Swiss-Prot record:
Transmembrane intervals: 82-102, 128-147, 167-187, 231-251
Gene Ontology terms: cellular component: endoplasmic reticulum membrane; membrane
Residue ranges of domain Fatty acid hydroxylase in the record: 174-299
Subcellular location: Endoplasmic reticulum membrane
InterPro entries: Fatty_acid_hydroxylase (IPR006694), Sterol_Desaturase_Related (IPR050307)
The UniProt record lists the keyword Transcription: no
Keywords: Endoplasmic reticulum, Glycoprotein, Lipid biosynthesis, Lipid metabolism, Membrane, Oxidoreductase, Steroid biosynthesis, Steroid metabolism, Sterol biosynthesis, Sterol metabolism, Transmembrane, Transmembrane helix
Primary gene name: erg3A
EC number of this enzyme: 1.14.19.-
Identification of the protein by name: Delta(7)-sterol 5(6)-desaturas erg3A
Leading EC class: oxidoreductase
Organism: Aspergillus fumigatus (strain ATCC MYA-4609 / CBS 101355 / FGSC A1100 / Af293) (Neosartorya fumigata)
GO molecular function: C-5 sterol desaturase activity; iron ion binding
Recorded topology in the membrane: Multi-pass membrane protein
């Protein structure tokens, strides 16, 4: 993520930090201790050297402006890096969320879903509100991983010449998917344990028939815990820098796609929107993120109903009643009483 941080610093960070924490402040009474601690005595993270510009990648060079040298917190200050990554993940996470979820809502999501008997009253505003509450906390918890990466603790590499062996730069993609799919399966399944389900994972299962805006509507610890494998991967396996940025974007888009209700992938391998709809409806199935492999091996795979893949039956009231009956039976076991407030048929007609 040093590429992203360099772009941020060049166009935003340098000016902001030079204005808020100008170099002249380093001579005041209160700042030297914090500055010195950040720049010279953090043995856990390694001592920081005076800032000298080095491009994050060989692909392009962003020559720093004068503002890069006018802050008491230079670019390589650990506190500045932490704050920058917190803001980057939070701000751009929200931007990507609204753009991708809105486009999916407009062009993909079937609006007649609001007529489903398990669609909640004011559901989409509640999904957005939950996301807005969770994003800053998830960003705060994610930032330490990114700081450790840019300070040299990860196995990120820049050019193909640096790959560990030939064709690894191609292999890294399926390896990333395989590793994170395995880890997220077990984390997600663990979140369904009765001891923690209601406090951590139930907020995401509030949405029985999710919209694209439910994609990031988690309890913050739930959303963060399922993202941990993505950030752990480059500390265990080599990963090309630009590939990491690409995968970071892909993950966010994929999360929206599996909540868009467009059941295109009737695949025995891909854990697409249909599989994930089965999970939201019936709780104890299809915990995987990308594939059905670990659900099959773990005995939790449930094949999506064939009716979901046919337009004439997907939104059929008889199919909805069948789904509702089974869902309510399972819900009593998982949650007990249902405290959700559903949209009435009259209200649903107004929303269409």
């Amino acid at each position: 993520m040093d590429i992203v941080l360099e772009i941020w610093d060049t166009f935003i960070g340098d000016r902001v930090y030079s204005a808020l924490l100008p170099l002249s402040l380093s001579s005041t009474v209160s700042l030297p201790g914090l500055t010195n601690a950040a720049n010279s005595s953090l043995s856990l993270f390694g001592a920081s050297k005076p800032f000298v510009y080095e491009p994050a990648t060989q692909l392009f060079r962003l020559e720093p402006s004068k503002y890069a040298y006018l802050s008491a917190w230079p670019r390589n200050n650990i506190y500045r890096q932490f704050l920058s990554f917190f803001l980057i993940v939070w701000i751009f996470g929200i931007i990507v969320y609204f753009i991708s979820a809105t486009l999916s809502y407009i062009f993909i999501w079937d609006k007649t879903t609001v007529k489903h008997p398990k669609f909640l009253k004011n559901q989409i505003p509640m999904e957005i509100a939950q996301t807005m509450r969770s994003m800053p906390v998830m960003s705060l918890l994610t930032a330490p991983f990114l700081v450790a990466e840019v300070r040299g603790y990860a196995k990120l590499y820049d050019s193909v010449d640096e790959e560990p062996f030939p064709y690894y730069s191609i292999l890294q993609f399926p390896l990333f998917i395989a590793f994170t799919d395995f880890c997220i399966y077990w984390i997600h399944r663990g979140l369904h344990h009765p001891l923690i389900y209601k406090s951590l994972h139930k907020p995401h299962h509030k949405w029985i028939m999710p919209s694209p805006f439910a994609s990031h509507a988690f309890h913050p610890l739930d959303g963060w815990s399922q993202s941990v494998p993505y950030h752990v991967f480059p500390f265990i396996f080599p990963l090309q820098k630009l590939a990491y940025v690409f995968l970071f974007g892909f993950i966010n888009l994929w999360t929206v796609m599996i909540h868009d209700g467009e059941y295109v992938a009737n695949s025995p391998i891909i854990n697409g929107a249909a599989c994930h709809t089965m999970h939201h409806l019936y709780f104890n199935y299809n915990y995987g993120q990308f594939t059905t492999l670990w659900d099959r091996l773990g005995g939790s795979y449930r094949k999506p109903n064939e009716e979901l893949f046919r337009r004439e039956t997907k939104m059929d009231e008889a199919e909805w009643k069948r789904q509702t009956k089974e869902m309510e039976t399972i819900l009593k076991t998982v949650e007990g009483e249902d405290d959700r407030k559903y949209l009435s048929q009259e209200e649903a007609k107004k929303d269409l």
